[in-house]
Amino acid sequence: MKRLAKSAFLATAASMLSACYQMPGDAYRLAETRQTYASETFGEVVFSRISDDVVMHTSTLDLPGMGPVRSNGLIVIADGRSILVDTAWSDAQTRNILDYAEQVLEAPVSDAVVTHAHQDKMGGIGALKAAGITSWAHPLTNSEAVSQELLPAERTLTFDRGWAVGPSRHQLAPLAIYYPGGGHTVDNITVGIEGTNIAFGGCLIKGSDAQTLGNLSDADVRNYASSARNFGAAFPAADTILVSHSPPQGRRAIVHTIALAERL
């Protein structure tokens, strides 16, 4: 299989912090592992190997007044296929992702889930539709997509106590999809990967060195902190936290996001 080399980690430097942030029913470990991941560019998109079966895709769009903004999503490989978590900014970039999964990873994308109704997460839905790939989203995401001038996903997720249930549970395995409540947007969902220590906080969770919570134009400011806590509690064993706009993080990113949100 033409994957990135299994020795994907070029260098690892670990810095352990012993403090913890206490919350009801949980204690957040602040252990941070900073790693340099093997990466390669395919078309307009950069691909970084996080584990044998998880690849992070990074696409960039030049936004007026902001300059180039990078956005991360995932390709999760399972049983000879792959599942896409978030599209790129555009259809063209998303086609690069689909081609990479098929030609390089030899694991064509069968399904995709988008984590909220912003362009960096679902701007490539058109490419998925053209390729016949089933796309899934929170019901609020599909309703919000119209107001954001975005194409909605093809199917709607069903949730029970925060967790996605029903047909998507099998179709999107090994993803464990969790709605923590509103934060970055009212519809933001998060993703754990069963059998790993990896969770994706999307745009809800910020990097541990972030100065702000970023774009709050569609935010649920009142519930942001509690939703970030819910994410951490939902995936207590995850110590590799992937986020939309920073390199891979440790659990400190969750604590830092909560602290930023409590200042709102």
What function would you assign to each model-found segment?
Residues R49-L98, T190-C203:
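Conserved beta-strand hairpin/beta-sheet module of binuclear metal-dependent hydrolase folds
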Residues L17-A19:
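C-terminal motif of bacterial Sec signal peptides marking the signal peptidase cleavage site
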Residues Y21-P24:
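Bacterial signal peptide processing site
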Residues M1-F9:
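Bacterial N-terminal signal peptides that target proteins for export
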